[in-house]
Design a protein with these regions (language model features):
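N-terminal glycine-rich FAD/FM-binding segment characteristic of electron-transfer flavoproteins
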Residues: 1-318
Length: 318
């Protein structure tokens, strides 16, 4: 039997998602640990308990924003060696994936990155992840005793109430980093809520010109929705910020309502919207793959359909 699960994310929301999932496995895999970097208020510690943490390990007196992946990996690996947890769940951000690889190397452990689901099958913890460019889903089992898994953001729902009572809190020390942070520059990017939006509108190559995005933006305003896009519009055409790219190489979203406009529906994009509560697709190609996953489909020219939607929504609200 595993001696526990250690959870780490540089963001509170990621911690809550991973803790919720880890709590489902306590009877089979042992207690849930959480690592906290820097000084945290008591309310934050209590939140970790509410989401399932039974043991909280803190490293006070450090600025988590200045710690490099190696320093964090060292702490995680030392916890796994000395405190007991055999399974490490790490949020699969850019930093998280680097940390996961470093921790696995230090522990001599197997590592799965970008997992989208976790389940117990017999004696095994099975992780599923997209492979072959998102065209297939692979089920993978790590055979080493220590196991490192990085989990894609928003793969699980964060649910409080997983645990009650107090948790054991223990302070740890961290050695001086071998890498010194000389300067930190914030990347200039527009602010958006693509990942957390209740309503999300994604536009694809069905839009002919950058100037035509105005009709999509008007629709977003009318529907109180965030704008997302497929990879070509952001990475190839540069019509939309890459911060709004949805799919296997972009954001993973769980809106209550997702409207897909001029999107063909290739798997590289749809993996980012699979968890939407309701999907509405607008495409003039009746055979577009997007209709296979849509709850509602409209076969029509987006240049006619979208403005009409906008007009009717505005009329209904006046």
């Amino acid at each position: 039997m595993s001696r526990g699960i250690l959870v780490f994310s540089e963001q509170d929301e990621g911690n809550y998602e991973l803790l919720t999932k880890a709590s489902e496995f306590t009877s089979q895999l042992g207690e849930v640990y959480a690592l906290v970097l820097g000084q945290k208020e008591q309310v934050t510690i209590q939140s970790l308990v509410q989401y399932g943490a039974k043991r909280i390990l803190t490293v006070p007196g450090v600025d988590p924003n200045t710690l490099d992946a190696e320093s964090i990996a060292f702490v995680l690996s030392e916890i796994a060696k000395n405190s007991g947890p055999d399974i490490l769940l790490i949020r699969s951000s850019r930093l998280g994936k680097e940390i996961a690889g470093r921790v696995a190397q230090k522990l001599g452990a197997g590592c799965v990155t970008d997992a989208i689901s976790l389940e117990i099958k017999g004696p095994d913890l099975v992780a599923q992840r997209y492979t072959l460019g998102g065209n297939t889903i692979s089920s993978e089992v790590i055979m080493t005793t220590k196991k490192v898994i990085s989990v894609m953001p928003r793969s699980f729902e964060a649910r409080p109430g997983q645990s009650a009572g107090a948790a054991e809190v223990k302070e740890l020390a961290i050695p001086s980093p071998r890498v010194e942070m000389v300067e930190r520059r914030k990347k200039t990017s527009e602010s958006n809520n693509v990942e957390s939006a209740d309503n999300l509108i994604c536009v694809g190559q069905g839009i002919s010109r950058k100037e035509d995005l105005v009709i999509i933006n008007e629709f977003c305003v009318a529907l109180h929705a965030e704008l997302g896009c497929t990879r070509p519009l952001a990475a190839d055409f540069h019509w939309v910020s890459e911060e709004r790219m949805v799919g296997i190489s972009g954001k993973k979203c769980k809106p209550k309502l997702h409207v897909s406009i001029g999107v063909s529906g290739q798997i590289q994009h749809t993996v980012g919207i699979m968890n939407s509560k309701v999907i509405v697709a607008i495409n003039k190609d009746k055979d577009a793959p997007i209709f296979k996953i849509a709850d509602y489909g409209i076969v029509g020219d987006l240049y006619q359909v979208v403005p009409e939607f906008t007009r009717r929504i505005k009329a209904a609200r006046t």
